[in-house]
C-alpha cells in the first residue's frame, strides 16, 4: 500500500503527521471521490515527487481517470490562479476592477461533479496561501451543500499533506 510506504518513510519527529495521515485516509466525512481527489490534488500542489507518486498510486485505487485528471487540473489551475489573485489582492483596490484575462475553463468543465472539483481547488488554495481563492471556493462548496466539517476535513488533508512533504524535504536535505 503506497500510503503505508509514505508513512513508514517519515522520521520520528513527524509521528503526528503519520498518525494524521492514517486517520484522514480513513475519514468518512467526505465521499471516496472527494477524499482521494483532495489527497491527490494537494499532493500535486506540494510539488514533491515522492508525495505525488505515493499518493497517486494510492488514489488510483479509489478514483476514475476523470477524477485523477481533475485533481491534477485543480492543482495546476490553482497554482496559476492563486498567484494571480494573491497579487491582485496585494496590489490593492486600484486593481480590483482589472480583468484577470486568464483562461480557467477547467473550473466549470472538469469532467467531475462541480462541488468535488471546487473542494479540491479549496484545499490547493489553502496550501498555496490564497485567502481570496480559499474563501471563494468555500462559498461555492457550502452553497452546493457541503458542511463546515467537510470543508475543514479538506483543509486538514491539505495541512497534513503539506507537513508530510516538509518532513520528506527535510530528510532529503540532511
Swiss-Prot record:
Its EC number(s): 1.11.1.28
SUPFAM superfamilies (UniProt xref): AhpD-like
Pfam families in alphabetical order: CMD
Disulfide feature: 130-133
Highest taxon in the source lineage: Bacteria
GO terms, biological process: cell redox homeostasis; response to oxidative stress
InterPro entries (alphabetical): AhpD, AhpD-like, AhpD_core, CMD-like
Active site as annotated: 130 (proton donor), 133 (cysteine sulfenic acid (-soh) intermediate)
Keyword Oxidoreductase: yes
Catalytic activity field: N(6)-[(R)-dihydrolipoyl]-L-lysyl-[lipoyl-carrier protein] + a hydroperoxide = N(6)-[(R)-lipoyl]-L-lysyl-[lipoyl-carrier protein] + an alcohol + H2O
UniProtKB keywords: Antioxidant, Disulfide bond, Oxidoreductase, Peroxidase, Redox-active center
Gene3D superfamilies for this protein: AhpD-like
GO molecular function: alkyl hydroperoxide reductase activity; disulfide oxidoreductase activity; hydroperoxide reductase activity; peroxiredoxin activity
Subunit structure: Homotrimer.
Recorded family membership: Belongs to the AhpD family.
Function of the molecule: Antioxidant protein with alkyl hydroperoxidase activity. Required for the reduction of the AhpC active site cysteine residues and for the regeneration of the AhpC enzyme activity.
Protein known as: Alkyl hydroperoxide reductase AhpD
Organism field: Corynebacterium kroppenstedtii (strain DSM 44385 / JCM 11950 / CIP 105744 / CCUG 35717)
